[in-house]
Amino acid sequence: MRIITESGDDFRAMPANTKDYAGIKWIADYGSNFKKNIPTTDAVIILNNKHTGKHLCLIEGNFITQARTAATTALATKSILMGDETNRIAFIGCGAQTMPHLQFLLEVIDVKEISLYDKDMSKAYNFA
């Protein structure tokens, strides 16, 4: 399910389930927040027991979202390289996802050089 606002920002419901659990990530994706210098995404995760319906947790979902996205990037990078060597990476955009991506990529690449670019170059300098 997706709700699109008048400004073009959106809310998304991302459900999942297993034999014993049902869960949902509810995420607000507000690209317009970039101009306000506030985070562009905000997420929460709810987990329920499928046998009783009881909620088991309600947790902040931003860290998990960042870690999952960065882990996916690292696994894809490792697969694409298939044993080839590289020691340079570049980030186009230096926001909330940059640090988790660097941390996960360092697990699969022997990084020697990092290039940074952002529309707001002060963000690239601050990250460096």
Model-derived features: where do they sit?
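NAD(P)-binding Rossmann-fold cofactor-contacting core
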Residues: 107-128
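Short glycine/serine- and small hydrophobic-enriched flexible loop segments
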Residues: 75-79
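Short helix-loop-beta connector
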Residues: 81-88, 110
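N-terminal ligand-binding/catalytic initiation module
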Residues: 1-66, 72-74
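Active-site-adjacent beta-strand anchor residues
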Residues: 59, 91, 117
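Glycine-rich Rossmann-fold phosphate-binding loop(s) that bind the pyrophosphate
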Residues: 93-95
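N-terminal Rossmann-fold NAD(P) dinucleotide-binding loop
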Residues: 98-99
